[in-house]
């Protein structure tokens, strides 16, 4: 049975990039005197694939399909080891005339562990591999990537206590930045029986946007359907795809974000052509990202037309790209610069402001 210990982990930053050193310290407060001779840190990263539920799945009666997990990183490092004063000075070992190694009697009788009766502080220093992918989690996504730092306390080879701390990893190499914007002008006609139709035209000055940017577009709808159109909705669709090791898509989930509708007009009458410019800002979404062999996220701008939100006649999507600033050219991070899909620990040595979207 593991001992009850209160752990407080304090790290030097709220997130890390591949190749950086995770530094900080951990404070251990035992409920009773505790002997420790070694403290290790275990860096663990895994990807989890979630199977999507079929439309006719009975949530109350049938169990959820199991998820599949693959370990990406499993690294260990010794953070602290008990040493006597003689051991630190190298005085505990001597050699005879045959160069045989012997321990002094003082060292042999000394304790091999340290007894802690109050809070003890141990350093943290462990390398994050350069190939580490970014942390990722989004409700409804077919895939998630999670990193943890486990602090393990040992005495005479037995693990007596442990604690896991979540880590956030950002990998800017997988984020699209060098994208050439281009204007978008598309027309689409949706045909119905008895020569009825709905025509849609949309003009976009660019197909590349930054987070929270104003989306300037013009939508024109020509209604030749049998009834008036009371529902026109504009929003961004997020598409998350899980990839296998050959970079092939094995599962995709579409997530609709909030959007806007007709600005003031209540309906588009039969035979009427109506143009409007909706007031719409890009939601606080992470940028397009592609992590080889793991996952990718893409976006599209969707226009939905119908009589009501539950009476949709037609919809059309146009691919767009959401980008972020080039962080490698900045010496300091600003609050509005970082948007990722993960929740971070609040235990940081310096409270660097950062938006972490769960």
From Swiss-Prot:
Q: Which GO terms describe its biological process?
A: protein transport; response to nematicide
Domain of life of the organism encoding this protein: Eukaryota
Signals that turn on the gene:
By B.thuringiensis pore-forming toxin Cry5B.
What happens when the protein's gene is inactivated?
RNAi-mediated knockdown causes variable hypersensitivity to low, chronic doses of the B.thuringiensis pore-forming toxin Cry5B but not to heavy metal Cd(2+) exposure.
One Pfam family from the record: Arrestin_N
> GO cellular component terms?
cytoplasm
The family database entries (SUPFAM superfamilies) matched by this protein are listed as: E set domains
Checking InterPro entries in the record gives: Arrestin-like_C, Arrestin-like_N, Arrestin_domain-protein, Ig_E-set
Summary of the function given for this chain in its UniProt record: Involved in resistance to B.thuringiensis pore-forming toxin Cry5B downstream of the sek-1 and pmk-1 MAPK kinase pathway.
- Similarity field: Belongs to the arrestin family.
Q: Return the protein name.
A: Protein ttm-2
